[in-house]
Amino acid sequence: MKIVIASSHGYKIRETKTFLKQLGSFDIFSLTDFPNYYAPKEVGSLPEENALAKGLHAARELNSWVIADDTMLMVPALNGLPGKLSATFAGEDACDKDHRKKLLQEMQSLESIVDRSAYFECCIVLASPEGKFFKTRGICEGYISHQEKGSSGFGYDSLFLKYDYKQTFAELSEDIKNQVSHRAKALQKLAPYLQDLLEKQLVSRN
């Protein structure tokens, strides 16, 4: 079964590919295989709004089942920021390091773990060319470190510590992160829908 990962981000593609290969026999592609495809601009205030828009658009344009996701980092003490600005917190043209630096600056007066609490929210959408879709949600709670730690991952990983771990996401091995992260939780909830699609395809072939 052909399925397209609606992302050109190497880490997201790798994590989703690993998950799909464990489930069954998929012909896996990503947006890197479609250089002429243009994704819609993310304008939603919630992860599910962006994931749904990306998924339905890509499925229709590429004529394939698609997996799309959107993730936001929420810091309650900052009224939910970065939130929908997670990818542009320090500006449209800023890099991940700039976003992390701005977050640390915004939180410099917050000392306790309670005040520095944060969570990642991820929504994943499985969409068909006909407009059918299934969506799942994963949340990972933790807090923001006072300084960057670790060199793996991307985005805010080097600042985020999951409550029951003493390492940031950027310090965890990729295998462990892929089991406990917000995206991992959302992908795991998607498994029954994908397995059902595979079974239906096998039946139709027979």
UniProtKB/Swiss-Prot annotation:
Broad class of enzyme this protein falls into: hydrolase
Keyword hit for Amino-acid biosynthesis: no
Annotated positions binding Mg(2+): 70
GO cellular component assignments: cytosol
Cofactor needs: Mg(2+)
Active site: 70 (proton acceptor)
SUPFAM superfamilies: ITPase-like (SSF52972)
InterPro entries linked to this entry: dITP/XTP_pyrophosphatase, ITPase-like_fam, RdgB/HAM1
Pfam families xref list: Ham1p_like
GO molecular function, one term: XTP diphosphatase activity
Its EC number(s): 3.6.1.66
TM spans (from-to): none
Keyword ATP-binding: no
GO biological process: nucleotide metabolic process; purine nucleoside triphosphate catabolic process
Cofactor annotation comment: Binds 1 Mg(2+) ion per subunit.
Keywords, comma-separated and alphabetical: Hydrolase, Magnesium, Metal-binding, Nucleotide metabolism, Nucleotide-binding
The reaction(s) this protein catalyses: XTP + H2O = XMP + diphosphate + H(+); dITP + H2O = dIMP + diphosphate + H(+); ITP + H2O = IMP + diphosphate + H(+)
Binding site for substrate: 7-12, 71, 154-157, 177, 182-183
CDD domains per UniProt: HAM1 (cd00515)
Top-level taxon in the UniProt lineage: Bacteria
Family according to the record: Belongs to the HAM1 NTPase family.
Assembly and interaction partners: Homodimer.
General function of this protein: Pyrophosphatase that catalyzes the hydrolysis of nucleoside triphosphates to their monophosphate derivatives, with a high preference for the non-canonical purine nucleotides XTP (xanthosine triphosphate), dITP (deoxyinosine triphosphate) and ITP. Seems to function as a house-cleaning enzyme that removes non-canonical purine nucleotides from the nucleotide pool, thus preventing their incorporation into DNA/RNA and avoiding chromosomal lesions.
Name of the protein in question: dITP/XTP pyrophosphatase
